[in-house]
Structure formats: C-alpha cells, structure tokens
Amino acid sequence: MVIRVLFRPVSLIPVNNSSTPQSQGPISRRLALTALGFGVLAPNVLVACAGKVTKLAEKRPPPAPRLTFRPADSAADVVPIAPISVEVGDGWFQRVALTNSAGKVVAGAYSRDRTIYTITEPLGYDTTYTWSGSAVGHDGKAVPVAGKFTTVAPVKTINAGFQLADGQTVGIAAPVIIQFDSPISDKAAVERALTVTTDPPVEGGWAWLPDEAQGARVHWRPREYYPAGTTVDVDAKLYGLPFGDGAYGAQDMSLHFQIGRRQVVKAEVSSHRIQVVTDAGVIMDFPCSYGEADLARNVTRNGIHVVTEKYSDFYMSNPAAGYSHIHERWAVRISNNGEFIHANPMSAGAQGNSNVTNGCINLSTENAEQYYRSAVYGDPVEVTGSSIQLSYADGDIWDWAVDWDTWVSMSALPPPAAKPAATQIPVTAPVTPSDAPTPSGTPTTTNGPGG
C-alpha cells in the first residue's frame, strides 16, 4: 500500500524573539508538527544537532605534569636529615637525580609507580643541591625536573663519643656514657634522639650530669643492676640534629655491648674485710684496710662505686698525703676521686683489724692479684659503714650513689606527673679541692692518686 502525503505550499515561520506567543500563523499547530515529523523543518533541527556534535568533538588537552619539591624550590637552611623528595602529578618520572655542588649524585629511590623520588641518605651541611631529570605527561611529552635548595650552615658541629667499646663485655652496673665536646643548650632535643634497647627488657633512664671541662655528658643506667647476660644496643641519631644556639650534631653513633657474669664487691668499712660475691655465692673473703678517716679526704666514700680501670702496675701520687710516684701492684680503680682496690704490703699489719689508708682499699699482694684478675669494667663495689657519701664531687661515675627518683629527675625531658622535681645538682662539675689526689689516666705517669 502506498501512502501519499500532499503538502500545500506554506510560508516559513518567522523567528519571533519576543516573549509574546504567536496565536495564529500561516500554518496550524497540527500541520507544523506533521511537517516536523517528515523533516520539513529539517534546517532548524540540523542546526541544533550540529551544535551538539561540535561540543563532543572538542577534546581538552591532557594536563601537563605538575612537580612538587620537598623542600620547596630555592629553599635555604634545610636541615640535612629532613625528608627530601620530588613528586609528579599527571605523569611519571623518566629519570631524576639530586647532585651536590661537587657533582656527586645523592642516593635515592623511586616509588613503585615512579611518581615520587625520595632521597635515601643524609645530606651534607652548607651545601647547594640541584635537581635534574625529566617527567612524562599523559600526552607523552617530557618536561624537565629542575630545582635547587641549600642546607643549613651550622655555627659549629658538636662531636660525641661512648666510653665503652663496641662489642665489649662489662659488669652489671656499667652505665652508658656519652661525652660531648661542647656544652649543649637544647639537651631535651638530644635526649629524644637517644634510644637504648636491652634484651631482656630492663627499666632505665638518661640523666645529664654536670658538664665537664670538655663539654656536656649524659649517662644511662638501669633502675636495678642488669641481669647477667643482658645485651644492650644504644642508638644516637645526632647527625643533622639541632643542638641549640646554631650548633648541630656531627655524627650518628651506635653501640652494642653485653653484660657478663654477675659479680658484686661487698665492702663494709667497720668489718675490715672485703667480699666478692657472684651467683655462686661468696667466692673471695679477704682482710683489708679502708680509709683512716682522720681527714675528709681520707674517707673511703660510702655508696655504690663502679670499676672503671685496672692496672697490674700503677704509679700513684698524692702530694697532700706527702708521697708521689709510688709503685703499686694490682690496682683496680673504683672512682675518679683516687679510690682504688690495690695491693699494699706496707699496710699488711692493719689489714683485717684497722683502717689506715688515704681512702683506698688495701689488700695483700696475693689477694689483690686474685681480685684484680676477676674484675671487669662496670662491676659494682658497694661500700657501706662510711661517714661520707659518694657524690658528684667524687668524679665521673657516681650514677648509683643517687636514688632512682633523683636519677630520673636529672633527665632533660618533661617529667611525668608523678616524677619528682629535679634535684639541685650543679650545672658544671665542681672544682677539685687543692688537697685532693690527682686523677691519672695512664698507669705509668706520676699523676696518680695514692692510698
């Protein structure tokens, strides 16, 4: 069946831009709709469709890669341990390098998607670093990676050192000592960078002792003696750390040591005897002579001393007591105020019955050698029954002469709510009295204490 549609000539509908509707026109509404259905008014319809096609055909170009530098480009006074990286958005890195002013490439690593490049080693002080490389966008076009920054120039760098050797085996009372070569104004920042890990875990804490002539010092000790066999690891992240007043740490340090057998010396002044005690019990019990105590400088100090040195031969001097360069055998130093446990045949008649020394603990030559061969750095020597307490005035290690609450109050970090107020201990070590024995660091000098 053929359907014929007849059209009468019609006039085009003029465009009416006014808001008034047209009530009548050359064709009826029905006819207009019929005409639209058969494409009579196609030119108008095509114009509208063409507009949509044009919009679909318009494609925005992909965004160019965006670079983010950390620290920002041209930054100055950057701390050399700060996180250093460059990140690209809307792209990925082809290659990236950071070089110092001497042209050395700094170690770094890409993220898995190659959108982040992170520096993996510390930087140097007072150095300009330059970024180079390229990143590729989604359009395949490369853009350069270019930037620079400068690290801080310290007013000075501060060095530090441990008193123990790495891998050393020590006694159950050995503290960890870090000696700095300069005073430190921001001790809290330094203390936060120090960690001690023990196996098995033991409770312990840092304390800042009075500064010595060479600089600040901080000690760590356990609350109680270490269990025998404990391993200790110390990590000091000091490089790049601000110490205050424009000073920075010179290097990181680490230390591993272990605690040996448990050995304690029991030294009761009024008994005129000395005992060496291990887990096996009393292994030595010797007659001895302690400080005469006629003068304060001749009093063997009360409290827990720590073995720090020992010499098979040692030359002692004590001008205040009237002698110098006296050869003694089997000398074990227990404090830096001149106290030793050593052989002294001259006091043999008093050993076991009276105290006649200048403060040292005298033994017979045979007994002194036997004790000497058993002693190691860090062994505690517990002196009781004396009239003067071991204190900060007596040298470098008096860590066990204070109670635990006093010890933790000497930390530079903010105290917990229950922590006691800081004990009033001098900021700097006291001046050695003129009549005190002269400490000695070597066994063959004339600058040794006598006793």
From Swiss-Prot:
**Where along the chain is the active site annotated?**
H342, C360
Gene it is expressed from: lprQ
Signal sequence region: none
Protein source organism: Mycobacterium tuberculosis (strain ATCC 25618 / H37Rv)
Q: Which residues bind substrate?
A: Y323, N337, G338, N362
User: What is known about regulation of its activity?
Assistant: In contrast to other LDT paralogs, LdtMt5 is not inactivated by the beta-lactam carbapenems; beta-lactam carbapenems form covalent adducts with other LDT paralogs but the formation of covalent adducts was not detected for LdtMt5.
Compositionally skewed regions (Low complexity) per UniProt: 437-451
Q: What is the lineage of its organism?
A: Bacteria, Bacillati, Actinomycetota, Actinomycetes, Mycobacteriales
The pathway is: Cell wall biogenesis; peptidoglycan biosynthesis
- What is the protein named? L,D-transpeptidase 5
